[in-house]
């Protein structure tokens, strides 16, 4: 792929003043996926600012693996910092190495095994509330389950149901509002409109709540096997540690990333399985064979190989984030185009992960393309659902573990059928996108049914 002769182009349809921002707000996924028809590196306009979109997997690899030059910045990260501050996902290059070293121990496999116990407890509690014949609205239900699961993993001390519901509502309001905030001019974001006030008030509540939890943990030196305790205890090789503000930002980051990623991926998986009953039947068979009617545990995960490939393929076709941005920290050449310092790069893993040069029949749902004897280096390189290079998501295994436990738990107890009123046109949120409407009917089952 590195021998490819790249073509640079310009996207048509820019409107005076707003550029292509109106298209990104109306049909963001369609707009981003349409750009490859105009070149491998495509120039767009967001308001008065020009930006460049790498549409070819090799160009995106160059951007993601050179984080010194292609630094975190641009419209997405400017607004994401409202929520996550200077956390690991949003921090610039100068802060990233130190933060990554300090957080690494909290995401080691030994820690993940401990977290999996908390994950299972919340997933089991959610499944226990369902009844034979229950119909659930997939994304909201799975979003709530994922948020409660991440919260229990972070913070093992019980909280009131009222606080848990308030946090869930606040996150939903903020993450939905962030999409709108990304494309509003600064002057409009400052206006005291009902939407802006809801966004600010809920954002303030989230920050205050997280700070209260950190303060409580600082006062109480009880040993806990949760993620917040691991962050508080982490040290680098020089004995340095994360400060309270840094821990605050990391907690918000983990909650936001871990919730939307898992909920969106699981929702798309149920849609895909409904369209491919032969793969669905194989999945039920694997879960029944491996678990034999028992709840899934950490030690079962390596044996759930088809489950893992289904998650990977869903992440390829519907990656958890539809848009990211970077900002060039110095002048650089990309696809033969000279980009001056301060140039905005915009990219969508969704469009790149369906590129024909990386995947045969890229629009087809084929989990077995990830079998060791079928996958290629090019395909692995083009898979950027969790990023790549030094800034690859530190929580990729965390999210995969949560998704695998949730999927195996649900399908070991329930036969899941998509209701006929499904509308799978994608709805974009701040980072993820999900079907407009996907309701699931749950029918109780036992292994072999």
From Swiss-Prot:
Main EC class the enzyme belongs to: oxidoreductase
Family annotation (Pfam families): p450
pH influence on activity: Optimum pH is 8.0.
Record InterPro entries: Cyt_P450, Cyt_P450_CS, Cyt_P450_E_grp-IV, Cyt_P450_sf, Cytochrome_P450_Monoox, PentlenOxigase
Domain of life according to the entry: Bacteria
Subcellular compartments: Membrane
CDD domains associated with the record: CYP170A1-like
Pathway participation: Antibiotic biosynthesis; neopentalenolactone biosynthesis
Chemical reaction(s) catalysed: pentalenene + 4 reduced [2Fe-2S]-[ferredoxin] + 2 O2 + 4 H(+) = pentalen-13-al + 4 oxidized [2Fe-2S]-[ferredoxin] + 3 H2O
Membrane topology: Single-pass membrane protein
Entry GO MF terms: heme binding; iron ion binding; monooxygenase activity; oxidoreductase activity, acting on paired donors, with incorporation or reduction of molecular oxygen; pentalenene synthase activity
Record GO cellular component, one term: membrane
Enzyme Commission code(s) on record: 1.14.15.32
BP GO terms, sorted: antibiotic biosynthetic process
Residues noted as binding heme in the record, renumbered to the chain: 393
Ranges annotated as spanning the membrane: 251-273
Keyword entries, A-Z: Antibiotic biosynthesis, Heme, Iron, Membrane, Metal-binding, Monooxygenase, Oxidoreductase, Transmembrane, Transmembrane helix
NCBIfam families: PentlenOxigase
Role: Catalyzes the conversion of pentalenene to pentalen-13-al by stepwise oxidation via pentalen-13-ol, a precursor of neopentalenolactone antibiotic.
Family, per entry: Belongs to the cytochrome P450 family.
PANTHER family: BIFUNCTIONAL ALBAFLAVENONE MONOOXYGENASE_TERPENE SYNTHASE (PTHR24291:SF50), CYTOCHROME P450 FAMILY 4 (PTHR24291)
Additional note from the record: S.avermitilis does not produce pentalenolactone itself in vivo but instead a group of new metabolites that are neopentalenolactone derivatives.
Record's protein name: Pentalenene oxygenase
Biological source species: Streptomyces avermitilis (strain ATCC 31267 / DSM 46492 / JCM 5070 / NBRC 14893 / NCIMB 12804 / NRRL 8165 / MA-4680)
């Amino acid at each position: 792929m590195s021998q490819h002769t790249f073509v640079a182009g310009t996207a048509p349809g820019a409107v005076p003043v707003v550029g292509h921002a109106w298209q990104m707000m109306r049909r963001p996924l369609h707009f981003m996926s349409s750009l490859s028809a105009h070149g491998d590196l495509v120039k767009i306009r967001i308001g008065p600012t020009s930006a460049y979109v790498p549409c070819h997997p090799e160009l995106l690899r160059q951007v993601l693996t050179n984080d010194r030059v292609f630094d975190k910045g641009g419209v997405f990260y400017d607004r994401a910092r409202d929520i996550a501050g200077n956390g690991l996902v949003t921090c610039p290059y100068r802060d990233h190495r130190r933060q990554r070293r300090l957080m690494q121990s909290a995401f080691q496999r030994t820690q993940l095994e401990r977290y999996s116990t908390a994950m299972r407890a919340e997933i089991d509690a959610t499944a226990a509330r369902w009844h034979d014949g229950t119909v659930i609205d997939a994304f909201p239900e799975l979003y709530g389950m994922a948020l409660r699961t991440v919260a229990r993993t972070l913070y093992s001390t019980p909280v009131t149901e009222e606080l848990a519901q308030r946090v869930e509502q606040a996150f939903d309001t903020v993450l939905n509002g962030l999409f709108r905030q990304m494309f509003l001019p600064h002057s409009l974001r400052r206006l005291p409109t009902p939407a802006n006030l809801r966004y600010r008030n809920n954002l303030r509540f989230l920050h205050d709540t997280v700070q209260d939890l950190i303060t409580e943990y600082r006062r109480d030196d009880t040993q806990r096997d949760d993620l917040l305790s691991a962050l508080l205890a982490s040290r680098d090789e020089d004995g340095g540690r994360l400060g309270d503000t840094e821990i605050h930002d990391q907690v918000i980051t983990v909650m936001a990333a871990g919730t939307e990623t898992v909920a969106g991926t699981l929702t798309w998986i149920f849609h895909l399985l409904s369209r491919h009953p032969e793969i669905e039947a194989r999945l039920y068979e694997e879960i029944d064979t491996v678990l034999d009617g028992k709840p899934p545990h950490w030690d079962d995960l390596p044996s759930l190989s088809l489950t893992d490939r289904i998650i990977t393929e869903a992440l390829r076709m519907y990656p958890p984030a539809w848009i990211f941005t970077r900002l060039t920290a110095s002048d650089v050449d990309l696809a033969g185009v000279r980009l001056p310092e301060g140039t905005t790069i915009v990219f969508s893993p969704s469009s790149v992960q369906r590129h024909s040069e990386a995947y045969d029949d890229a629009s087809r749902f084929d989990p077995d393309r990830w079998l060791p004897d079928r996958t290629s280096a090019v395909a692995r390189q083009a898979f950027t659902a969790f990023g790549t290079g030094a800034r690859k998501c530190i929580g990729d295994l965390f999210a995969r573990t949560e998704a695998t436990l949730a999927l195996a738990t649900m399908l070991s107890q329930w036969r899941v059928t998509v209701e006929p009123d499904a509308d799978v046109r994608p709805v974009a949120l701040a980072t993820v996108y999900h079907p407009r409407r996907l309701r699931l009917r749950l029918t109780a089952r036992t292994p072999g049914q």
